[in-house]
C-alpha cells in the first residue's frame, strides 16, 4: 500500500467514524484478535441490519470523535487505544453479544502461543502405533501398548495457564488432535446514551436481580431484628413475633382471642 493509499484509507475511516458516531447512540468496544474472516462474516450475518462494525486507524477515529464536539463522547476518546474496534447497533446489546459469543473458533496450539487455561491430556488409547512410544517416554508420559495402540496410562498436564507453547507441546497436542485454544470477538465496554458500562453487566438477567434483591432484603431484615430496630424489611417478622407473644399470653391466661381460634383451626 502506497502512502497515498494509506492516507485515503485513513480519511475514509474518519468519514465513516464521524457518520456512525452521529447516527448511533449505542455502540460497543470490541477486540478481534485472532478472529478470522469467516467468523466475522457469520457474526455480521446474525446481526443482520441491526449493527455495523468499524475498524481502522485509532488516530482517525479519535479525530472524528474530537471534531464532533459532543461532550458525552469525551469518555470514549480515551478508550480508543490498542486493537479496539466499534460495533454500532440499534437494538439490544444482549442480542449483539449473543451473536459474538456463539461464534467461537477452536484452534491448535502453535509455538509461541500463551496458554489460555491449563491443558491436560487425559488417559486414553491414542490410536498411535507402538513406534511412537519413545516420543511419549521422552516427554515423561507413562504409556503402555493396548491392542497394538499406544495408551496413555494417567492424565498428563501439558500446559499451565500463562505458559508459552513450546515445540514439543505443540507437536504433542497436534498429534492427539487437541485444540486447546478458543478465539472469538470479545466485547469490553458498552456506550448507551452517554453512559459507559462494562459488558459483563448485560449478562445479568431479571432473575439475578430479583435474587439479589431478595437476599438484600433478608439481610436487612435479619440485621434489624438483631438490633431491635423496626424497618420496612423487618416489619412482617415483627408483626409475626408480636402475634406469637400475644398468643402465648392469651394461652397462659386461659383467655381466648379470635386469632387464637383461627390458628387452632388451621
Curated annotation (Swiss-Prot):
Any one GO biological process: cytoplasmic translation
GO CC terms in record: cytosolic large ribosomal subunit
Keywords: Cytoplasm, Ribonucleoprotein, Ribosomal protein
Entry-linked Gene3D superfamilies: 3.30.70.1730, 3.90.105.20
Localization annotation: Cytoplasm
SUPFAM superfamilies tied to this protein: Ribosomal protein L10-like
One Pfam assignment: RL10P_insert
GO molecular function, one term: structural constituent of ribosome
CDD domains, alphabetized: Ribosomal_P0_L10e (cd05795)
Family that this chain belongs to: Belongs to the universal ribosomal protein uL10 family.
Role played: Ribosomal protein P0 is the functional equivalent of E.coli protein L10.
Subunit structure and binding partners: Component of the large ribosomal subunit.
This protein's name: Large ribosomal subunit protein uL10
Organism: Encephalitozoon cuniculi (strain GB-M1) (Microsporidian parasite)
Gene: RPP0
Amino acid at each position: 500500500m502506497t502512502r497515498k493509499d494509506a492516507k485515503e484509507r485513513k480519511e475514509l475511516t474518519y468519514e465513516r467514524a464521524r457518520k456512525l458516531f452521529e447516527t448511533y447512540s449505542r455502540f460497543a468496544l470490541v477486540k478481534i484478535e485472532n478472529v478470522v474472516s469467516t467468523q466475522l462474516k457469520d457474526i455480521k450475518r446474525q446481526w443482520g441490519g441491526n449493527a455495523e462494525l468499524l475498524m481502522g486507524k485509532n488516530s482517525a477515529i479519535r479525530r472524528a470523535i474530537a471534531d464532533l464536539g459532543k461532550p458525552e463522547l469525551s469518555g470514549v476518546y480515551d478508550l480508543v487505544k490498542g486493537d479496539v474496534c466499534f460495533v454500532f447497533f440499534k437494538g439490544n446489546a444482549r442480542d449483539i453479544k449473543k451473536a459474538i459469543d456463539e461464534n467461537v473458533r477452536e484452534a491448535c496450539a502453535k509455538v509461541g502461543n500463551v496458554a489460555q487455561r491449563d491443558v491436560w491430556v487425559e488417559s486414553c488409547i491414542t490410536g498411535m502405533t507402538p513406534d511412537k512410544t519413545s516420543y511419549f517416554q521422552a516427554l515423561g508420559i507413562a504409556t503402555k501398548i493396548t491392542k497394538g495402540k499406544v495408551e496413555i496410562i494417567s492424565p498428563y498436564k501439558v500446559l499451565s495457564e500463562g505458559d508459552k507453547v513450546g515445540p514439543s507441546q505443540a507437536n504433542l497436542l497436534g498429534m492427539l488432535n487437541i485444540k486447546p485454544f478458543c478465539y472469538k470477538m470479545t466485547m469490553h465496554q458498552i456506550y448507551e446514551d452517554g453512559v459507559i458500562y462494562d459488558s459483563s453487566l448485560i449478562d445479568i438477567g431479571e432473575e439475578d436481580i430479583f435474587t439479589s434483591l431478595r437476599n438484600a432484603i433478608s439481610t436487612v431484615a435479619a440485621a434489624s431484628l438483631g438490633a431491635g430496630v423496626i424497618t420496612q424489611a423487618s416489619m412482617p417478622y415483627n408483626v409475626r413475633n408480636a402475634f406469637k407473644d400475644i398468643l402465648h399470653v392469651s394461652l397462659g391466661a386461659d383467655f381466648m382471642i379470635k386469632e387464637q381460634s383461627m390458628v387452632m383451626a388451621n
